[in-house]
Amino acid sequence: MKNKLVIALGATIMLVSACHKTEDPAPVTTDFNTMKEQVLIDFTNKVAVPGYKDLADASDNLYSTLQTLNDNPTEDNLAAARTSWKNMRTIWEQCEGFLFGPVEDNDYDPNMDTWPTDYVQMDSLLNSSNNLEVSDIQAATLSLRGYHPIEYIIFGNHGDRKAADITTRQKKYMISLATDLKGTCHDLYQSWTADPVNFAKQVITAGNGSAKYAKKQEAYLAIVESMIDICDEVGGGKMKEPFDTRDPQMVESPYSGNSLADFKNNLVGLRNVYIGKYKEDGLGINDLVSSKNVALDNKLQTQMTAAINSFDNITVFYEDAIINQRVQSQNTMNALNELKQTLEGELKPFIIQYITD
């Protein structure tokens, strides 16, 4: 990210641009007390805020490509819109590695990413007399809002939608959805970077005047709990629910065939949080862990890599895999469960033991 992100935190805290950080990296420290402050700073400035900035920018780009498709419904413009949608999903799914704070408190997550969707319900809305204005979308059932109705309109079933077949009503719905989604993403970014919430400041000053976290430990536990939650959501929800029911309609992102990429990026986002890296390196929780317990750090990183790589063994759409590649699917869920158990049973107690202030 090239533009500067500046968060006012008084005379003691100053952010510099990513470019400057690359040219003049901060000196590495092995002092635990210093590291536990720097890890919160780097998580905020190098993972969370840049991720949400990229998400807001991606929402602008998606809106632009959908507007172009609306004005000129060619196959090339449809392909560009699909690419923009998938690119935005990559960013968002990685941001789901830290679903705490405003994204949860203000319902930004369900407002833009509720699943499963019901194409019958969407078709019913499209065939109704609803005006499909942005305000109508915001008042609708959550499953009729956000990424997945856009996905349904531009992909159809696994990409069989033709640009010329997108109806006037679908275009109206699509643009209102994109407008609403764009607003949500910008609100989410602003909630981290601007008053009155300025959640970045609340994380960085945890235990030192934060209005949200009286102790650093509270901020760390919120971060670790979000890692546990996304691990459980993917393995115990996104994958397991359609797997157990053998119901393809329960799968997230089914119209685009993007489900496995979504799941994998959730775990990439979890690892980003742990190692303090998104586009550039920072100090991460791994540095704290390895300074006290090298074996635990090795175990966590090995399990994260194994879980991420396991998705590559599923070689068909996940809605097909729940029928035809059940062993591979179960192996991935097992890997996710093992990681979750280590996060919950070993990393969380580590935080409680070593970060007490």
Each language-model region and where it sits:
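Mature extracytoplasmic or organellar-lumen-exposed domains after removal of signal/transit peptides
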Residues: 26-357
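Bacterial Sec-dependent N-terminal signal peptides
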Residues: 2-39, 357
